[in-house]
UniProtKB/Swiss-Prot annotation:
Belongs to the RNase T family. GO terms for cellular component: cytosol. Trims short 3' overhangs of a variety of RNA species, leaving a one or two nucleotide 3' overhang. Responsible for the end-turnover of tRNA: specifically removes the terminal AMP residue from uncharged tRNA (tRNA-C-C-A). Also appears to be involved in tRNA biosynthesis. The active site is at residue 181. This is Ribonuclease T. GO terms for molecular function: 3'-5' exonuclease activity; magnesium ion binding; nucleic acid binding; RNA exonuclease activity, producing 5'-phosphomonoesters. Its cofactor is Mg(2+).
Length: 223
């Protein structure tokens, strides 16, 4: 591999992690008891010059799992009617199986060894996706069990804003508040925001960084 490829490859940029932007809409705040109602995923790619851009997208309305709690306040907030047949909702298994398949394909093509969730206030989205994957008994979950890239934190650092809409505007991106709290729209905007932050850091000279003195001393995942 050439030096230039080493500097611009997705796997080298994030230490073997494959970033995947996720957003969920739910019927509450408890990932174990409240329904997952909508999920979207956007994968990312790097061009030959090392600039990050969105790649593939998947979006699903999701059927509440058996016994799931539907909090009225949450439904009023996101405007979702879980029982509307026009939603075309699928099971948690079908939604996550398709997303995981897309992610594993992208990991292989990018020479990455583990997917990492990118999300705005990522702990929330991560907890719901992981709980749904466990309920669906999906064994080949490509995502790291606890490491995430949180665009709320990154936006606070890079842009001085932590709310998604305000962070997008601060980054010079449009944000349509009438489409907010749609998993698809929020995921697409979060993907663009993450790409802008990563690319801005590169434009400012923050990437690439000098190589570590002793790569064999690099801590392993979770250390």
């Amino acid at each position: 591999m050439s030096d230039n490829a080493q500097l611009t490859g997705l796997s080298d940029r994030f230490r073997g992690f494959y970033p995947v932007v996720i957003d969920v809409e739910t019927a509450g705040f408890n990932a174990k008891t409240d329904a997952l109602l909508e999920i979207a995923a956007v994968t990312l790619k790097m061009d030959a010059d090392g600039w990050l851009t969105p790649d593939e997208t998947l979006h699903f309305h999701v059927e509440p799992f058996e016994g799931a709690i539907l909090q009225p306040e949450a439904l009023a907030f996101n405007g979702i009617d879980p029982h509307n047949p026009l939603r075309g909702a699928v099971s948690e298994y079908d939604a996550l199986h398709a997303i995981f398949k897309m992610v594993r394909k992208g990991m292989k093509e990018s020479n990455c060894n583990r997917a990492i969730m990118v999300a705005h206030n990522a702990t929330f989205d991560h907890s719901f996706m992981m709980a749904a994957a466990e309920r669906a008994s999906l064994k080949r979950n490509p995502f790291h069990p606890f490491v995430t890239f949180d665009t709320a934190a990154l936006s606070g650092l890079a842009l001085g804003q932590t709310v998604l809409a305000k962070a997008c505007i601060a980054a010079g991106m449009p944000f349509d508040s009438t489409q907010a709290h749609s998993a698809l729209y929020d995921t697409e905007q979060t993907a663009l925001l993450f790409c802008e932050i990563v690319n801005r850091w590169k434009r400012l000279g923050g990437w690439p960084v000098p190589p570590l003195a002793a790569e064999d001393a690099t801590p392993q995942d979770g250390e």
